[in-house]
A protein has these predicted regions:
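Short acidic/proline- and small/hydrophobic-mixed sequence motifs that coincide with surface turns
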Residues: 50-54, 69
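Hydrophobic beta-strand segments
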Residues: 56-57, 74
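Conserved aromatic beta-strand anchor motif in extracellular beta-sandwich/beta-rich domains
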Residues: 59-63
């Protein structure tokens, strides 16, 4: 059965992993239009200098009460993510008929030109919270771009 998914929620990563060739960028929760199922999609960026051919991540999805709905590994295989490329947002790592409230992500291993790189020892560095734009500026920006989600001061996302 074909079904379309629409964006329910999107959250950027609140940290980066200093020195890692791969950065976690955001998590998106999408809702199926016919079944109501929630798909969890993760987005990553190759910030290294070599093509990324694979990535293994560990994720944990929780409900509003903090109960674990799913904990598993996901394998992004046969990638050809060149330096600077963003990937993963079109792969659902988990589909649930129960609402998902939070997702925790840990990067495990990257494959750069087939060579495995352990990502578990890279330290997380917390990012500053986005600053909210004054209402009039946000409204003007939204009108000019046609994007109502533009409510915060743009941040440098180059790591």
């Amino acid at each position: 059965m074909d079904q379309n998914f629409s964006l329910m929620a999107q959250s950027r990563a609140n940290y980066y992993t200093a020195g890692s060739p791969v950065q976690f960028v955001r998590v998106e929760l999408l809702k199926g239009d016919t079944t109501g199922e929630v798909a969890v999609c993760l987005t990553f960026k190759n910030v290294g200098t070599e093509p990324l051919t694979g990535l293994v991540v560990h994720f944990k999805c929780k409900d509003a009460a903090g109960q674990v709905l799913c904990e598993d590994d996901f394998y992004y295989e046969q990638l050809n993510a060149q330096p600077g490329a963003v990937f993963g947002s079109d792969d659902a790592v988990y589909v649930s008929d129960t609402p998902v409230s939070s997702v925790e992500v840990e990067q495990d291993r990257a494959f750069l030109n087939g060579r495995g790189v352990d990502l578990r020892n890279y330290k997380r560095v917390r990012l500053n919270m986005p600053r909210v734009l004054p209402g009039s500026i946000a409204k003007t920006l939204q009108q000019r771009t046609g994007n109502v989600q533009l409510t915060c001061v743009p941040q440098d996302t180059e790591y």
